[in-house]
């Protein structure tokens, strides 16, 4: 597989959320607003990139019987570092994300790429695979955060977009359903349906 394909495929035919249906829980939990969705996206991307790189570098020295334990130790260490950076520089977002940053440790995307790719590939392709899957995940999270905050709260990144456009004065009201977790699940379902309708080879 070419290096470019490692970044390109997770955006379309091998998207971790739309095709593999991994990492859906965070889609429901952190996408009510755009800012936490972006921060979570960056956090997961950094963790999956670095964990892929580290495990790939160590792949020939890890005993098969304890590989999952080693992977969890590496991912846990990276997640703790990311969490501390967020608390130091983005404390408000860190509080908003709460336990969900810690739950990156159990994110199926991270563990899936370590098992399926990093354990059998060289460091550079593993790093690119982590980047591609992180970005593929990020596109969906940021899209959901954009739509849900705009139509649910009338804001984007806290800026009152709908108010500035004067839509409230003509009777527009925020859709409270948009900021509820079930709506995120519905939106993910709609995106998956649209994606598979455009890619017939993905249909079972």
Segments predicted by a language model, with ranges:
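Short amphipathic alpha-helical coupling elements at transmembrane boundaries
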Residues: 6-9, 56-60, 125-133
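N-terminal membrane topogenic signal
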Residues: 7-18
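Hydrophobic core segments of alpha-helical transmembrane domains in multi-pass membrane transport
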Residues: 24-28, 44-49, 76-83, 105-109, ...
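Structural signature of hydrophobic alpha-helical transmembrane segments
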Residues: 34-50, 70, 94-105
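C-terminal ends of transmembrane helices
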Residues: 51-64, 111-121, 194-196
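Cytoplasmic-side transmembrane-helix entry/capping segments in multi-pass membrane proteins
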Residues: 62-75, 96-102, 129
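Transmembrane alpha-helix boundary signature
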Residues: 81-96
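Short, membrane-exposed interhelical loops at transmembrane-helix boundaries
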Residues: 157-177
């Amino acid at each position: 597989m070419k290096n470019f394909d490692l970044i390109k495929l997770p955006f379309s035919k091998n998207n971790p959320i739309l095709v593999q249906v991994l990492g859906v829980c965070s889609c429901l939990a952190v996408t009510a607003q755009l800012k936490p969705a972006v921060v979570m996206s960056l956090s997961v991307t950094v963790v999956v990139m670095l964990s892929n790189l580290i495990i790939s570098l160590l792949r020939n020295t890890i005993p098969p019987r304890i590989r999952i334990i080693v992977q969890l130790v590496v991912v846990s260490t990276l997640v703790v570092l990311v969490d501390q950076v967020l608390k130091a520089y983005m404390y408000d977002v860190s509080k908003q994300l709460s336990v969900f940053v810690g739950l990156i440790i159990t994110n199926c995307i991270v563990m899936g790429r370590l098992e399926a790719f990093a354990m059998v590939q060289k460091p550079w392709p593993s790093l690119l695979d982590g980047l591609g899957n992180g970005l593929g995940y990020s596109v969906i999270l940021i899209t959901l955060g954009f739509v849900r905050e705009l139509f649910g709260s009338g804001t984007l990144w806290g800026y009152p977009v709908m108010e500035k456009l004067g839509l409230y004065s003509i009777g527009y009201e925020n859709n409270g359903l948009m900021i509820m977790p079930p709506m995120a699940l519905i939106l993910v379902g709609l995106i998956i349906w649209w994606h598979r309708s455009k890619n017939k080879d993905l249909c079972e």
